[in-house]
């Protein structure tokens, strides 16, 4: 019934099992990957034909985590998984990026890759098994795919690279890098680092590429024994006559368009060329009595002509689209404190790319609580990236963030997080929001620069300035050119897009997407060195504008004080059902967080409110001591004495015999409910009962007065 094929191999410190032929047999391809009890099912379905008029490759990748994989039941009313989490979205992008370039040009059939996480070992992240599974599923499916792809995670611990580290090892590492590629080439890198050198980063990429070969070999074996027949797909033959005619009609005008340095003017000119070319082809068809070529086909030909123009100009040493040489960074303008009532803000402009970045400080209660498969944890630092359509002069949908925005936000967060002060040094939670107001390439790196400046404006004591730069590459045969600070058009027309962020000391984030095979270690070395040169230039501009973090927080930012209480007293501060702490926060206008070890953090924009909250918490948690004198309030009168409140929640008995020295016939002659009375604690017992005395203070006062009286002559 089943044609089950299994391949097993040892990969670093883990044993890996690939399996196909038993589960999801109606999919084009399906593979189960098991890495030390982290199990994923990767499936691929490809449409047998492209939709009419399709002019792009419709690939979708969905990585889905099932809560049952960790032995949990989902929260919420419906008790089932809902919209994808940020982690699922980021992992979907991570898998998509190395797979997409390996489908052949002209293949427009819809392809859907779905990965289900079925079982989770908390120590083994599921993203690498998912990427290996997706690659293997595509390989066994028979779809036209120039894979397989391998992947590896690399850590850097004690000056040594570690392959596919556990979660505990990742926490101890100064590097978390994921690399994916084929047998011959690296295709994708995603990383976060603690100010490491370019040599260490490149070494990690090379190490990961070498170590992934065993996974690629295992996929080849799986295909050999359990793969489906290869699809009989051939790209549509090129219409050489149409290509020649479009080139004749448009090439000179496209050349003229790329002499325009302004993006808006250039875009307008390109639209004119596209429209005029289509109109002329329709006239040709009408005159010949034939059907004109569809606009998608014409558009693809025009795009190819554009690419040839731009690429040849750069490789021949001519100026780039905006007139720069290959190493020059666009003009930079920096302004901080641009918004009056925010905690920190910066406007970072680089050429036609601009980011308005805002930093907000909060308390521990503002931290993001994430319920992940491996367990719940809190995020103290959040960074959100938004790019509305007006940033590129277009109209479009405005709403929840798209995958691209989530990915760019995470990259900027990775770049900054290692340079933040620790929670012990700076107890605030931090949210940074980057609003892209103009975009022409490298908006995520503008978010890094603007984010660092906004944090410093907010008074966050950053370890160092952090800057980011986007680089490009054009490669033809043995000739190549590395481009510093790429434009949007150069990104689309180039062969590699990689972004490097870091400080003067080293790299904090590296993201690389390579669209072709054949990029060597030497080319990457040149690219990283040129990126460092550009980063240092930007850091110089940033340091000149803002030398360091503000020493004063914004008047609108919360202030914090911390006190330590006995952990056994936490329940007294919280009260039944939270009644005490709720009343405290409402009456003092503060936010109060209490950790399990008894550290109380009080935050407010009002210093008076913080002082009052601190005083009341100290009163609630204070211990009644024998011999101490208190100013108490009479709560209740009894026949034999009075109940006096000394501290919040702490009362004592003032016996009728301890009010005054003479005999008291009627307690009402001496005390009234609500009266303030000074009393001394004379006894406590093991049950917590407290006995008070007022006459003891009277006797002490009388004795003191007598000792001050001069002797009789």
Swiss-Prot record:
- Indicate the segments forming the KH domain, all copies: 558-617
Q: What's a single GO MF annotation on this record?
A: magnesium ion binding
Supply the EC number(s).
2.7.7.8
Which InterPro entries does the entry mention? ExoRNase_PH_dom1, ExoRNase_PH_dom2, ExoRNase_PH_dom2_sf, KH_dom, KH_dom_type_1, KH_dom_type_1_sf, NA-bd_OB-fold, PNPase
According to its record, what are the GO cellular component terms? cytosol
Which keywords belong to this entry?
Cytoplasm, Magnesium, Metal-binding, Nucleotidyltransferase, RNA-binding, Transferase
Q: Which cofactor does it need?
A: Mg(2+)
Q: Where does Mg(2+) bind?
A: 491, 497
Q: What is this protein called?
A: Polyribonucleotide nucleotidyltransferase
Q: EC top class, in one word?
A: transferase
Gene name, Swiss-Prot/TrEMBL: pnp
* Reactions accelerated catalytically: RNA(n+1) + phosphate = RNA(n) + a ribonucleoside 5'-diphosphate
